[in-house]
Amino acid sequence: MEKYLEDELPGDRVECLRQVEFEKDCWGETGMQLPCRLNKPVKPSVLDAQSLGVSLIAFRTLSSVKHTSRLCMTGRLGLKKGCLLVEEVGVCIPLFEPGDQVGQLRSTQTTSKRKAASRKGQREQRVNARLQEERRKDMAFAESIWTFMPGKKGSVVQGPNTRTLTNAHDGILDDINCAQIAGKHVGDHSNCANVIKAGVISLLGKLVQYPERPGEPFCRYYMKFGECKHMTFCKYNHPKDRFSCKTTNTIRSESLCLHDQQTTILENQFGLPSLVDKATANTTNLVASASSSMTPDEIGEGKNNPDEVFVCICGEKLLFHTNFNTTAVKELVVFALQRRNIKYCDIYVTWLIPMEYERMDELIDRAVRDNNNDLFYYVNLPPELINPYKDTWVTFLSDFSRYIIHQLLQYLNDTFGDPPSWIADISWVPDMWKTYNYSPNNNSTLWTPRYTLDLNSCSHFARNFLNHFGREVSLQAAEAAVSQNLEFLLPTIMMLMPVYSGPHHWNNDFMEILLNTNSDRSNGQIS
């Protein structure tokens, strides 16, 4: 084997040719593999240690290993030369700096075996002396700061619900006898296997002190599971005692990790109770509030409102925080989207992408099962409700028009007969009917509607309903419209009318109405 290592190892080879799947041992017992290049101690890079946040004990342990079948230097899979490949968990970490030191691991054919043996003996003496000193420091270091999180294989986390290393020797060091390790030779293969157990744990363990950021919203994932995938880069607050922080205030909007514009638009700009505040007051309404106040085992056990529905639109999940079947939301959806003689056709298969409905309990169960941090996503609300920025509306309408669902249209087609016109549809919605009959200064002589049954008037009404949203509108209707973005659905469905009842250029007329800031319902014309 020594002759094989010294004479047959190619000088220009910089990677272990052992199979990536680790089906064969690194020493090449089958005769088809070359031995691992990691047969000599390699000086670790302290810079890499700090940047990776890996414990120094991992570097000291690995730098003392002469050879092990668990580690190899590899350049495959697009990895940088000098990466450390850990077999037990399949993780690659760039620990060592490739260069002249790696090249010096190989003895040339011109070097005599006597000199090689002398160098080997001197090197082993230095390694043994350094190992004994570093192992003493490492164990003191580990006893002072290491904590172990149960239930996670190879996970070493410094967190609020963890045990100390002293109480978890069975979980971390397992079968390792520290006294025996200190007295054994570093080249002993059986000893290396035990050393690597501690090395793998320290490599993969996230020795991270999660940042405490007073004044910032609580990290929803950390509050629920006790750890955060963003570690020190997370911008939210990670209190040490996360269980004592679950008060009524923390279940409010700050626990949802939402932007200020999304959570406080109604409360700050219009003096109306925020949707998030109202929903979190009843902790069964929002997934985030429920998950913040409940353990993962309690989620999905029927403690949430089964009538709540999440709707996936344009790849994002939107929350219907009211009962879809019994509230004014049903009226806004049904009577705004009623169509005349809608028939299911292939256009919805090729042009439109279905909207996926998911019940809250099913979504939470899957999210907890998949360890998903994004239970739902709140779409950015327009900066103003009464007079929103037209760019926001037009951009959303252009995108959303490609995702109108055929399930909902089919549902309307099966439920309703043949409504006479779009005017009859909106007449069942009080707030829309108020807009339709609006007259300046309540002058009864001007109550005569300016709208007709054609598509232009329908689109014109849609724009007026959006841009002249009445201040006297009921709070329930306003919340329903905002929370479900139904203010988008009405003009979008109306824009689909050319598919059934008109020429294609009507779509352009609709966009002209939306883009025209001078359009006003009082004259019923596009100025």
Curated annotation (Swiss-Prot):
The keyword Electron transport does not apply. It comes from the Eukaryota. Disulfide bonds: none annotated. One of its GO terms (molecular function) is DNA binding. A zinc finger (C3H1-type) spans 213-241. The keyword DNA repair does not apply. This is Putative zinc finger CCCH domain-containing protein 64. InterPro entries: Plant_ZF_CCCH, Znf_CCCH. Keywords: DNA-binding, Metal-binding, Zinc, Zinc-finger. Residues 103-127 are annotated as: Disordered.
